[in-house]
Amino acid sequence: MDSYFTLQSNIEASGEFLDRKSRFIAQLVHIESEDEANAFIEMVRKRHYDARHNVPAWILADGRERQSDDGEPSRTSGMPTLEVLRGAELKNVCCVVTRYFGGTLLGPGGLVRAYTAATQAAVAAAQEAGQIVEMTSVVPVDVHVAYPQYEQVLRLAQDSGAKVADTDYADTVTIHLVFKAGEQEPFCAKMRELMAGREEIEVGAPEFAEF
């Protein structure tokens, strides 16, 4: 997987759906782990302690995912919520749909439609607010060069598709670069050729970040 979409950190998107006086409130956040998902689920349960159901679903970038019907009939709530997240190609997100019962049974089909609609509303709200971001597999590369070579190396890096994250000026110049995974290799080869073996390059481990 080279990239995926997720919700911005420290954001909670929400959406609502009403059907025959039952109120469905979808709450969507970014997570990095199962523990973070569980913590958010527990927080929502405390927030809506008086609700009939708090239905959770979450997906991690490593492929793990989980959902629960939280007392609703089997596969009428948690799975529809999860399917919306899958359909939006979201990873590292957790959605909890709270239901306040309105006194009328909606039936399996009605429940599927309601939980789907509430989750879709939360995803749409995040999209409209520009809160959905693409996370790309990137590789950090630190280059240490003498001052006379700085401009030349900077141009080479930018021509090679790098983004400059930061620059440190000391006895030498350290340029902190970020490449899409795989694009750092041609740059490193050109650096070895350009500097005739005198280059100092530190290549970090791949990670996911906005690029």
PLM segments and residue spans:
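Short amphipathic alpha-helices in soluble, non-transmembrane regions
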Residues: 153-158, 187-195
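Long, charge-dense
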Residues: 112-138
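Conserved short beta-strand edge segments in small beta-sheet-based binding/regulatory domains
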Residues: 164-169, 195-211
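Terminal, non-globular segments
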Residues: 177-184
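C-terminal regulatory domains involved in ligand/effector binding and gene-expression control
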Residues: 1-76, 189, 202-211
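Glycine- and acidic-rich phosphate- and metal-coordinating loops
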Residues: 59, 91-102
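Short glycine-/aliphatic-rich beta-strand segments at the starts of folded cytosolic domains
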Residues: 131-149, 175-177
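Short amphipathic alpha-helix segments
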Residues: 142-163
